[in-house]
Amino acid sequence: MGINEIIMYIMMFFMLIAAVDRILSQFGGSARFLGKFGKSIEGSGGQFEEGFMAMGALGLAMVGMTALAPVLAHVLGPVIIPVYEMLGANPSMFAGTLLACDMGGFFLAKELAGGDVAAWLYSGLILGSMMGPTIVFSIPVALGIIEPSDRRYLALGVLAGIVTIPIGCIAGGLVAMYSGVQINGQPVEFTFALILMNMIPVIIVAILVALGLKFIPEKMINGFQIFAKFLVALITLGLAAAVVKFLLGWELIPGLDPIFMAPGDKPGEVMRAIEVIGSISCVLLGAYPMVLLLTRWFEKPLMSVGKVLNMNNIAAAGMVATLANNIPMFGMMKQMDTRGKVINCAFAVSAAFALGDHLGFAAANMNAMIFPMIVGKLIGGVTAIGVAMMLVPKEDATATKTEAEAQS
């Protein structure tokens, strides 16, 4: 049994615990029947429900872009392919740079990869779980949640996170190379050359984004927000066209992928968008309760991380929450000290969703890549913390130290 299978078994263990809690909550609660242990698992049933209800949000984000993937590859290919080949990289890296793995990046990467499975997985699942989500999701969502005065800390944190994405990608690629990833019994050939050469365009983009966030942060952040709005419009167009094609047979956009199983598809080998979403939700039934219960059971050691990083408990809790979803963390930012704000935003660039949606997506689509993806995301997040600690303005760092001393 490999590490990827072990991770799946652990999540299913937590899924069963959460299912028990949901059942017992109908009759007075887990504590009533299971005593102290029951009290420790209360609330996991609610996370069980959250995991399944995520299907709707996932569908809105994924289905349209998944259907559009071959169309976008056909339109963008003539421009993207020559540029990336000139840099010595596979064109699939374009997809993971701009799109999250679960917002079309994985499927567009496959279309652009030209049959190179390793490059497809490297972009679609490793890069596409770090840079893509930051640009199309995290920054636009954060702007709608955080206080306007915290935008400068968001920019600093994202800057720290972006520049360490290549480190996380290389780490994930090396784990994939040494763990012997296989698809349908066939080995996927990750090589040093592939891992390093495909980082060239990523490093260029990371440097440009970092320079923009350093010198024109407001304009860069607003630019990401505008890009995200256009992306939502494109995804909605694709979703509407795909549904019309499925229900009426009208092909409003030629070349769309089916969103349900089509004639010729082999069950278990080919999964279309709707089935993929269902599979992700099944994984999230266990992933969400797992994060809740591990956070509760290991609260003291997790909170001690905050002391090591010299930030308050709210900031430490935000980092833990980020591993499942970064939206709660952004909601907590106004209660964090300055150092904690920058560190959390930096950590979220790579590490967000590592034990949430991205874990569910990898498990549903390519479970051989679960461990490489998680390792890459965590190393990217941890190294981003180191950079963030150097970027906190001196006057703010002094204020943070005073706040930390007051807490203790």
UniProtKB/Swiss-Prot annotation:
PANTHER family in the record: ETHANOLAMINE PERMEASE EUTH-RELATED, ETHANOLAMINE UTILIZATION PROTEIN EUTH
Pathway given in the UniProt record: Amine and polyamine degradation; ethanolamine degradation
MF GO annotations: ethanolamine transmembrane transporter activity
Family: Belongs to the EutH family.
Transmembrane stretches, start-end: 1-21, 61-81, 89-109, 126-146, 155-175, 192-212, 230-250, 274-294, 313-333, 342-362, 369-389
The gene coding this protein: eutH
Intrachain disulfide bonds: none
Source species: Escherichia coli (strain K12)
Protein name in UniProt: Probable ethanolamine permease EutH
